[in-house]
Amino acid sequence: MISDMVVVPTADVTLAGDLVVPARSRAVVLFAHGSGSSRHSPRNRMVAAELRTAGLGTLLMDLLGEREERRDALTAEHRFDIGLLGRRLVAAVDWLDTQPDTRGLPVVLFGASTGAAAALVAAVERPDRVLTVVSRGGRPDLAGDALERVTVPVLLLVGGRDQDVLALNQEAARRLSCPHALHVVPQATHLFEEPGALEHVAETAGRWCDDRLWDAQESRTSARTAPARSREET
């Protein structure tokens, strides 16, 4: 297993991250934290640990630089700038494709709260690199017009007792034209603090990623065999 503290370059700042890549990883999960959080989010770290046991690499990174963090703590001007956060994720997706341990691996964007909107925006920009988007208690509505342009599969995970966010996710699901699923975690509130709630999230997300990896493999197999079938039929 490779475990490193990394620095991810973007157009205007460098961002700190923690990259862990188990041996024979099948994909890498890039976490996008919510407003007021960071790469140290205990909930994201718990989910990341579970996903690594399923053979997925993880990158937890800050979406704001240190100076931006300090300013945002006073003004909250960056935390809802979904365009900015989306560009940061795009830069991270591109960076992962330059690293020897993650080059060529499919990328799963896992967003929480406002990070989910940023993940959807990034998925529109990198559909060939992003395998799927997973949203945990997310605000997909904040993705704006990008929501209708997402083409990769999307999983929306929402707590059953998080009524306002559940309603927003139900509306977002109606706007998605890509393959998608809305999964309600029974009795969970917005932060999934209830016993077993985050484990439920990690297990459901892991199964979803397994299925999407299988779909991608099937698609590649079909693409390789389709010309041969066409020649036989003619």
Tell me the role of every PLM-derived stretch:
Residues 5-102, 191-196, 200:
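Serine-hydrolase catalytic machinery in alpha/beta-hydrolase-like enzymes
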Residues 101-113:
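Alpha/beta-hydrolase fold nucleophile elbow
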Residues 128-140:
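A conserved short beta-strand
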Residues 150, 156-158:
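Short beta-strand/loop motif that positions the catalytic acidic residue
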Residues 163-169:
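Conserved alpha/beta-hydrolase "acid-adjacent" motif
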Residues 176-191:
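Catalytic histidine neighborhood in serine/cysteine hydrolases
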Residues 188-191, 196-234:
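Catalytic active-site module of serine/aspartate enzymes centered on a nucleophile-bearing elbow/loop
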